[in-house]
């Protein structure tokens, strides 16, 4: 759920950011070019975001925490049984 919300915030920030000065006024000759450019920009930003998440220590720490918690609960259930 948090990943979904994070991605939603990234997409909204990209959309609300607007055009950069180098882009200027888009050419209306082919509206699909604008859509294709937006898709490529969005793809690059999402890939960068996913790489940032996968290279961080957060997933490893979370996995370790879940493993440790599961092990503790399992031990408590063995003792009580």
From Swiss-Prot:
This is Apolipoprotein C-I, acidic form. Its main location: secreted. Coiled coil: none annotated. The gene is APOC1A. Residues 1-24 form the signal peptide. One of its GO terms (cellular component) is high-density lipoprotein particle. It is found in: Secreted. Keywords: Lipid transport, Secreted, Signal, Transport. GO terms for biological process: lipid transport; lipoprotein metabolic process; negative regulation of cholesterol transport; negative regulation of lipid catabolic process; negative regulation of very-low-density lipoprotein particle clearance; triglyceride metabolic process; very-low-density lipoprotein particle clearance. The lineage of its organism: Eukaryota, Metazoa, Chordata, Craniata, Vertebrata. It comes from the Eukaryota. Gene3D superfamilies: Apolipoprotein C-I. It comes from Cercocebus atys. It holds the Pfam family ApoC-I. Apolipoprotein C-I is present in acidic (APOC1A) and basic (APOC1B) forms in P.paniscus, P.abelii and P.troglodytes and perhaps also in baboons and macaques. The two genes for ApoC-I arose through a duplication process that occurred after the divergence of New World monkeys from the human lineage. In human, the acidic form has become a pseudogene sometime between the divergence of bonobos and chimpanzees from the human lineage and the appearance of the Denisovans. Pseudogenization resulted when the codon for the penultimate amino acid in the signal sequence was changed to a stop codon. The keyword Transferase does not apply. One of its GO terms (molecular function) is fatty acid binding. Belongs to the apolipoprotein C1 family. InterPro entries: ApoC-1_sf, ApoC-I.
């Amino acid at each position: 759920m948090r990943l979904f919300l994070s991605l939603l915030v990234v997409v909204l920030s990209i959309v609300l950011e607007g055009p950069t000065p180098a882009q200027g006024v888009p050419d209306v000759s082919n509206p699909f070019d604008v859509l294709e450019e937006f898709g490529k920009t969005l793809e690059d930003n999402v890939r960068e975001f996913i790489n940032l998440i996968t290279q961080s220590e957060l997933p490893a720490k979370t996995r370790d925490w879940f493993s440790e918690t599961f092990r503790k609960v399992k031990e408590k259930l063995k003792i009580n049984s």
